[in-house]
């Protein structure tokens, strides 16, 4: 599972997920999976989508993951009264804005990449679209 090796602070405030994304172009591979909606991806969701793609292309080609879960999410245990401080870190998320290219793929035919990204998109909680590299 993806998570930072070390952080400056253990816990962060919730905050908001506004604005537009950086990393909106396909830069490493030939094809990409781009976010249309906004939301947050857990490390488990990122890994599940990666596995779905890898299995479908039968480990040919190359896959890049362009998102990293760097925000800790805390939860208090069940049946615990409110107060007594912030809960423990339970999982890590990556905040996704519209336009962010989340995964890229290279070295496979377009139809195979399309199907692999479709399977991966089923594992993710946000709407996505298939994009190709723009050649100038």
From Swiss-Prot:
Keywords: Ribonucleoprotein, Ribosomal protein, RNA-binding, rRNA-binding, tRNA-binding. The keyword RNA-binding applies. The keyword Metal-binding does not apply. InterPro entries: Ribosomal_uL16, Ribosomal_uL16_bact-type, Ribosomal_uL16_CS, Ribosomal_uL16_dom, Ribosomal_uL16_sf. GO terms for biological process: translation. GO terms for cellular component: cytosolic large ribosomal subunit. CDD domains: Ribosomal_L16_L10e (cd01433). GO terms for molecular function: rRNA binding; structural constituent of ribosome; tRNA binding. HAMAP family: Ribosomal_uL16 (MF_01342). Belongs to the universal ribosomal protein uL16 family. PANTHER family: 50S/60S RIBOSOMAL PROTEIN L16, LARGE RIBOSOMAL SUBUNIT PROTEIN UL16M. Binds 23S rRNA and is also seen to make contacts with the A and possibly P site tRNAs. Part of the 50S ribosomal subunit. This is Large ribosomal subunit protein uL16. It comes from Aliivibrio salmonicida (strain LFI1238). The lineage of its organism: Bacteria, Pseudomonadati, Pseudomonadota, Gammaproteobacteria, Vibrionales.
